[in-house]
Design a protein with these regions (language model features):
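Short, charged low-complexity linear segments at domain edges
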Residues: 1, 87-111
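Residues immediately within or flanking Cys/His clusters that coordinate Zn2+
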Residues: 9-12, 122
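Short cysteine-rich clusters marking metal-coordination/redox-active sites
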Residues: 15-18, 125-128
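Short, non-ligating residues that shape and space the ligands of small metal-coordination modules
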Residues: 24-25, 131-135
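Short cysteine/histidine-rich metal-coordination sites, predominantly Zn2+-binding motifs
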Residues: 30-41, 138-151
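Long intrinsically disordered, low-complexity regions that are acidic and Ser/Thr-rich
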Residues: 41-93
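Eukaryote-biased detector of low-complexity, proline/serine/threonine-rich segments
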Residues: 117-126
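Charge-dense, extended regions
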Residues: 149-177
Length: 177
């Protein structure tokens, strides 16, 4: 994922282990962020009329596409002009973006999640240092960064990061505006 600008989201939640309130942070991307997508197991019949084994531009969605006829894979580098996104399960992040995030929280660092069975950058409780898993915060409706009411959304404070790009290997989903 790449974006020419980003926002650090800040909120608070109860730690699952010690039950004390702890600050948590996330990364929001504004419209026009770019992301890479890989589609495996594509049937050659679905490629009819496509340019094979060469990158080419597309207009809808806007970006670049490569149909690999030898591996039956589609590689896409797309731009999202319509919606904001929030990152989760961040496996890698550019060092300059991470240093800005760490100015807000020293408790955002890589840890292994037994639930997700992977290592990713995660929030940790400021009291007991327990990892605060991304799923409940970012992917579960009603989670701190997945508000379902305007009252929940008002609890999120956005810090705009100016003049800094972000590169990340992460999941993303459309953020509710």
């Amino acid at each position: 994922i790449f974006s020419q600008r980003f926002y650090i989201a800040e909120s608070y939640q109860s730690c699952w282990r010690c039950k004390k309130i702890t600050p948590v942070f996330g990364v929001f991307l504004p419209r026009w962020f770019s992301y890479r997508d890989v589609v495996c197991g594509v049937k050659p019949a679905e490629w009819e009329g496509r340019i094979l084994d060469k990158w080419y531009e597309t207009s809808s969605p806007r970006g670049m596409v490569y149909f690999d006829s030898k591996k039956n894979i589609i590689y896409q580098w797309l731009t999202n002009p319509k919606a904001w996104a929030i990152l989760s399960n961040v496996r890698r992040i550019s060092s300059s973006a991470l240093s800005i995030i760490n100015k807000h929280s020293k408790l955002y660092y890589p840890a292994y999640s037994k639930t997700a069975k992977m290592t990713y950058y995660a929030n940790h409780c400021c009291h007991c240092k327990s990892m605060q898993g991304d799923f409940m915060m970012f992917d579960e409706p009603g989670g701190v960064f997945y508000p379902v009411t305007s009252e929940q959304a008002k609890k999120i404070k956005l810090h705009e990061v100016i003049n800094e790009t972000i590169f990340a290997n992460a999941n993303h989903r459309q953020a509710i505006e």
